[in-house]
Amino acid sequence: MVREVLERLMRGENLNFSEALATMNELMEGKYTEAQVAAFLVALKMKGETEEEISAFALALREKARRVITQTEGLVDTCGTGGDGRQTFNISTAAAFVVAGAGIPVAKHGNRSVSSRSGSADVLEALGVNIDLDAKGTARCVDEIGIGFLFAPNLHPAMRHVAKTRREIGVRTVFNILGPLANPANIVGQVLGVFTPELQETLAKVLNNLGVERAFVVHGHGGLDEVSLTGPTRVFELNRGKIDSYLFDPLSYGFSYCSLRDLQGGDAFENARLLQEILDGKPGPLRDVVLLNAAFGIMAGGVNDFREALVMARESIDKGLAAEKLEKLRRLSHEIKEAG
C-alpha cells in the first residue's frame, strides 16, 4: 500500500477518507520506513492536503491517543499551529488561564517549541507546572480545578514513529496542522490560530467533521497564528455546523494597535515572567492581546456576545481568578506526580 499511496500523491491525486485513515494508521503503527515517512510527508505537502485527508488523519491520531476522560463537559482548547515565525509571547497559553478563570473549563493541548523559542509546554514548565502527567492525572486537573495541560508526547505515543523524520526534514508538514486537531479530550469548543489564511476555511470544516460545536479559526494581521493587536484578524467561525467568515478589528472594541515587537517574547523563562505579570494585572499590549484571544475562547465555551466575553476576560484577570487557576494547576500537578 505504501508504494501505491506515494505514487498517487506524486501524481497529484487526493486520497479519500478511508484511504487517508488507513494510511495514517499504518504510519502510526510504524509500518513505514523513515525514508517512506519523509517521502509521504513531502509528497502530501507538494500536492496540498484536502479537508477529507486532514479529517481522516486527525481522527486516526485521536483514536491512537491515550484518551483524557473527564467528568467535565463543555471543554475548550486554545492553541495555534505554530510556524508563523513571529516569535510572539505565549498568547494562547496565557489566554487559557483567563478562559478558565472566567468559568469555562479548558483542556489545553500542547507541546514544546516548534518554531519559537518557547512552546506552551516550555513556558508552563518554567512557571513551575508539572507537565509530565498521564491521561488520568490530566483529567483530574480538568475536573478539580477547571484547567489541565495535555502534554502531547505523553498522550500520543504513536507519534514516535514520525518524530525523527519530522525533525530531520525541517519543513512544515501536515503534522503542524494536525497537532491542534488531535486533542485527546472531548473538546466541544476551540480557538485555533493558523499560520496561513489559506488553511482557515478547510480547518473550520475539519473541526466540524471532528464534532467540535463552536470554533474560531483565526489568522491575525502580521501573519500571526493568534487574534492580533497589530491590525485586523480574519476569522472563520464554526457554530453548530454553520461556518461564517469576517474581519475582526480590535479598534471597534476600544483597543489600540501596537507593533509586532510589543507582542514578542523571549525564552521560556522570560515568557513565564511576562505571563505571570499579565495574570497579576500588568497593563499593556500583552494584556490586551491576551484579553482578545481569551474573549474568543470564552465564546467558544458558549457565550454568544463578544463584549460580554470581553468583560468576563477582564474580570478573570482583575479579580485574580486567572492567576488562581495557574497557582492551583501548579500545586495540583505536583501533588498528582508525587502521589504516583
From Swiss-Prot:
InterPro entries: Anthranilate_Pribosyl_Tfrase (IPR005940), Glycosyl_Trfase_fam3 (IPR000312), Glycosyl_Trfase_fam3_N_dom (IPR017459), Glycosyl_Trfase_fam3_N_dom_sf (IPR036320), Nuc_phospho_transferase (IPR035902). Binds 2 magnesium ions per monomer. GO terms for cellular component: cytosol. Anthranilate 1 binds at G80, N111. It is an enzyme of class 2 (transferase). The keyword Transport does not apply. It comes from the Bacteria. Catalyzes the transfer of the phosphoribosyl group of 5-phosphorylribose-1-pyrophosphate (PRPP) to anthranilate to yield N-(5'-phosphoribosyl)-anthranilate (PRA). Homodimer. This is Anthranilate phosphoribosyltransferase. It comes from Carboxydothermus hydrogenoformans (strain ATCC BAA-161 / DSM 6008 / Z-2901).
